[in-house]
């Protein structure tokens, strides 16, 4: 093992920071799909030699899967990984001269580009393909292995829109995988916002969704095999799913979430409890008391406790004031000197989805849904001060300042955290800044679709709330 021996002699750091493989953790991306896609490519083209290019980070693992399947099919394999660089919507790898010479004019091999995605721009895939074409690789000898198959017309990158349709692509959808077929057999698809038709038949009252960001979910309705309805929602492969299941079981044991029935192929099974999604009109003493207990329970039982990244919050608020309200509003914001308030405050597993429709009224009270995903995804806020959820509940249910202070006081008293109410004004700024940014980007991405219009409406509401929050901050309220 000369390579491992050489590696062992290097001065390695004491710790390494690893990226979460988003597809495996959040988006029901199964390595088996790439095995099947590679097998399909091998059957169709019977390649003699393949250069398998994984795009980092997750493309490293996925390209190894593709390479293994093709090697088993008899192909000679060369593997390498590249990291596309540059502006977010114009990314492409940069090769050192020796590697570029090695790849130049390789007409004897297929070049297979492997990654999850494409994302909004499509530029990682197409930028890599364009690089290879520039090295003399025939376009007809390049194949892409993506995690989904858009037509490319909506890509932000103009070059990606031009190149994507010309390239061969090999993809096997989740629905075609064996365990995908098993999970979906007899189930109703609730993914991509389809759950709204089940719980809110009046389409005019549907809450806004960003379908591209929703996790896969299915409902098994009552039948011979399932006497009671069961919800299956993707929680993550391996340890990611196990951690979500464990926390969901804890919330259910506390009486705040539906019972957990198991974890299978990365999908968590929970009881589908009959109930009605809430609206702002449902705000009342019983709900406020339940929400206060829920927020406190999460803080006391959080599976994570990290150092709060206050600089990120400060930067987010300032950037979104400048972007969302205008640079002149920065003067109203003033100097955000809040560090003393947050000294020794940990970042914990907040809910981060305290919107009314995420609560349901049942025969026995209130339950919180969607409670284990959003402190651990690739959107803001991640693990955060527990007061984030206090601010979220107050903003989304429209609490006035007095009611918000009372709610914060109740949570603070339960946690013996007397400074929590004092942290609420700044976290209200940060919460609304985050929601404004998310809704605005979703509206832009979804365009003239019904959800695009819903997100545009939300953007206006959050902009109004953001202005109010900045004015309250300026006045010291």
Residue map of PLM features:
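Non-catalytic membrane-proximal stalk/linker segments that position and tether the catalytic domains
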Residues: 181-200, 327-328, 456-476
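PRPP-associated nucleotide enzymes
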Residues: 1-211, 276, 282-283, 303-306
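Short, structured interface segments
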Residues: 171-174, 361-363, 367-370, 461-474
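Helix-rich C-terminal or lid/interface subdomains of diverse kinases
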Residues: 391, 405-476
